[in-house]
Amino acid sequence: MPAISRDEVAHLARLSRLALTDAELDEFAGQLDSILSHVKVVTEVPAEDVPPMANPNAVTNVTRPDVIVPGLTPEQALSGAPAVEQDRFAVPQILGEGE
């Protein structure tokens, strides 16, 4: 006999806004009972001395020094562009009329 009844599964399905058939209710009752038995095993692990944490590994940001380096000149940046207007990339208009 599952610890979770068919009615409890139906109630959970209603709360979750899931439309389950009678066969699905019976199937999920057994599956949820099995899942809860596995969760119970995990809760029995002695962990009183383990502090609460989000991640067991230390997480640190890996950054590089913020150093200014020379970039491309405008001419170099625009050299590969298919179309240029007024020292800018020219692209097809996609929104409304131009100004």
Curated annotation (Swiss-Prot):
EC number: 6.3.5.-
Protein family (similarity comment): Belongs to the GatC family.
Enzyme class at the top of the EC tree: ligase
InterPro entries xref list: Asp/Glu-ADT_sf_sub_c, GatC
Chemical reaction(s) catalysed: L-glutamyl-tRNA(Gln) + L-glutamine + ATP + H2O = L-glutaminyl-tRNA(Gln) + L-glutamate + ADP + phosphate + H(+); L-aspartyl-tRNA(Asn) + L-glutamine + ATP + H2O = L-asparaginyl-tRNA(Asn) + L-glutamate + ADP + phosphate + 2 H(+)
Quaternary data: Heterotrimer of A, B and C subunits.
Record protein name field: Aspartyl/glutamyl-tRNA(Asn/Gln) amidotransferase subunit C
PANTHER family: GLUTAMYL-TRNA(GLN) AMIDOTRANSFERASE SUBUNIT C, MITOCHONDRIAL
HAMAP family membership: GatC
GO terms for biological process, alphabetical: glutaminyl-tRNAGln biosynthesis via transamidation; regulation of translational fidelity; translation
Cited function: Allows the formation of correctly charged Asn-tRNA(Asn) or Gln-tRNA(Gln) through the transamidation of misacylated Asp-tRNA(Asn) or Glu-tRNA(Gln) in organisms which lack either or both of asparaginyl-tRNA or glutaminyl-tRNA synthetases. The reaction takes place in the presence of glutamine and ATP through an activated phospho-Asp-tRNA(Asn) or phospho-Glu-tRNA(Gln).
GO molecular function per UniProt: asparaginyl-tRNA synthase (glutamine-hydrolyzing) activity; ATP binding; glutaminyl-tRNA synthase (glutamine-hydrolyzing) activity
TM segment ranges: none
